[in-house]
């Protein structure tokens, strides 16, 4: 939808906040604007604020809080000095216990409004570490000529700009406390203008940085990164092109993996692989999902969008057989290796694009008792429409987007005869508006 940012009245106005939007902004309806909705960053339900308009569109306006006139009792002082500028977090001003309450509300609203379904029971919200939890992410890097400095950080709320971060409390401390050193290192490079991003990922025993560079690094620049890695305990990878171009700079062998001790499983991964960002929540989520699936020793389970085997390999410790299917062939190769490394011969893996026709695939024709799926933000409707759903006793759906979960839940309940037994939010990304959730369906 087209938005106007320049030619409108930016005079601050006073308004009451009635709700919290799905992206963490306060919601107001302005009487002088005919009840038109305005989304206001930095505002909480129950507050009276002065806000400055930032954008207008036909159906809603946008604004930012400039003064809180009457504060919510749930408002707290943000821990981060960059809150309100950096887009990495949008909820630090809301009491931690209330953040997950808000996410539960977003989930239930989506299920009812989009899917036209209501769970028989609301699952207790699941939480893990709230600070220093983020073990995977991507920083933007930008040389600002006017300031004669390099910025390393997440995007600002205005995504045209990179936040100038001195610290980040949501990423693991080894990363969050060293952002200024990263910026200074890039600023001192010969190729300082050729680094658009730095990715980080942490295993249990190593933390890796992947440096995206548009031109070959000079020998001097490479040595600077090696010295930084040796001093601060990082592994450095270089990425001159696409994903396949990633290779180690120092050291040459990097043991990237994380353990799931409850199932005696160790999962190895590569620097750009997908892993769940919150290690403590991930372990709780796996316990939760397997319990909700009611996995039994004689079960055959299908695990769709299985990735490295995050759910598949723990399931293999519990059930007779599990089949994991994933669209990324590299992840499938790592999942197979992980099964072998962990001595699991009852886990099979297939590479398949689950947005395309898979009705003749070998794995599709096998019989299964239960289904677990953890799709991307786009959801799983395409593959759900192909599966022999009536053969599954129970489905556990792990979701990273409540809208696509709600759509798919509507299909399962209203068109395929399943019951939505329960659903609940999981706080994978505390202090952000991201809603992770889990839902359980049973065949009627």
Swiss-Prot record:
Pfam hit, one: tRNA_U5-meth_tr
Residues at the catalytic site: 400
Binding site for [4Fe-4S] cluster: 80, 86, 89, 168
CDD domains xref list: AdoMet_MTases
InterPro entries with a match to the protein in the record: 23S_rRNA_MeTrfase_RlmD, MeTrfase_TrmA_AS, MeTrfase_TrmA_CS, NA-bd_OB-fold, SAM-dependent_MTases_sf, TRAM_dom, U5_MeTrfase_fam
Entry binding sites for S-adenosyl-L-methionine: 276, 305, 310, 326, 353, 374
Keyword S-adenosyl-L-methionine on entry: yes
GO molecular function, one term: 4 iron, 4 sulfur cluster binding
Alphabetical list of Gene3D superfamilies matching this protein: 2.40.50.1070, Nucleic acid-binding proteins, Vaccinia Virus protein VP39
Documented EC number(s): 2.1.1.190
Domain TRAM: from-to ranges: 5-67
Annotated signal sequence range: none
PROSITE patterns: SAM_MT_RNA_M5U, TRAM, TRMA_1, TRMA_2
Keyword Methyltransferase: yes
Protein's UniProt name: 23S rRNA (uracil(1939)-C(5))-methyltransferase RlmD
The organism of origin for this protein: Xanthomonas oryzae pv. oryzae (strain KACC10331 / KXO85)
Gene field: rlmD
């Amino acid at each position: 939808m087209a938005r106007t940012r320049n030619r409108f009245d930016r005079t601050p106005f006073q308004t009451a906040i009635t709700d919290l939007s799905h992206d963490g902004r306060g919601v107001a309806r302005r009487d002088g604007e005919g009840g038109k909705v305005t989304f206001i960053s930095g505002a909480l339900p129950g507050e009276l604020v002065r806000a400055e308009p930032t954008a207008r569109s036909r159906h809603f306006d946008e604004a930012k809080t400039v003064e809180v006139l009457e504060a919510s009792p749930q408002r707290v002082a943000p821990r981060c000095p960059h809150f309100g500028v950096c887009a990495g977090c949008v909820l630090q001003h809301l009491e931690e216990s209330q953040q997950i309450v808000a996410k539960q509300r977003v989930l239930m609203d989506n299920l009812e409004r989009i899917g036209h379904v209501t769970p028989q029971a609301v699952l207790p919200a699941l939480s893990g570490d709230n600070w220093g939890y983020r073990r995977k992410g991507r920083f933007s890097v930008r040389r600002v000529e006017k300031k004669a400095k390099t910025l390393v950080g997440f995007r600002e709320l205005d995504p045209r700009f990179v936040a100038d971060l001195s610290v980040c409390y949501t990423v693991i401390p080894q990363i969050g406390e060293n952002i200024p050193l990263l910026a200074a290192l890039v600023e001192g490079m010969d190729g300082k203008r050729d680094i658009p991003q730095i990715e980080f990922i942490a295993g249990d025993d190593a933390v890796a940085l992947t440096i995206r560079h548009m031109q070959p690094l000079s020998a001097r620049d490479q040595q600077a990164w090696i010295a930084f890695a040796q001093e601060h305990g990082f592994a450095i990878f270089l990425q001159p092109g696409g994903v396949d171009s990633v290779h180690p700079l120092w050291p040459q062998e990097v043991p990237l993996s994380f353990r799931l001790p409850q199932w005696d499983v160790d999962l190895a991964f590569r620097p750009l692989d997908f892993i769940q960002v919150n290690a403590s929540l991930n372990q709780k989520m796996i316990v939760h999902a397997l319990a909700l699936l009611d996995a039994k020793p004689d079960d055959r389970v299908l695990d769709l969008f299985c990735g490295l085997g995050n759910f598949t390999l723990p399931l293999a410790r519990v059930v007779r057989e599990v089949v994991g299917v994933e669209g990324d062939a590299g992840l499938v190769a790592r999942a197979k290796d992980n099964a072998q490394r962990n001595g699991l011969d009852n886990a099979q893996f297939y590479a398949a694009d689950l947005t395309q026709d898979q009705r003749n695939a070998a794995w599709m024709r096998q019989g299964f008792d239960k289904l677990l799926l953890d799709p991307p933000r786009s959801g799983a409707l395409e593959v759900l429409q192909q599966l022999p759903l009536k053969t599954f006793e129970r489905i556990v759906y792990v979701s990273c987007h409540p809208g696509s979960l709600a759509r798919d839940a509507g299909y399962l309940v209203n068109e395929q005869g399943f019951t939505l037994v329960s659903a609940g939010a999981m706080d994978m990304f505390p202090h952000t508006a991201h809603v992770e959730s889990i839902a359980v369906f049973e065949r009627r």
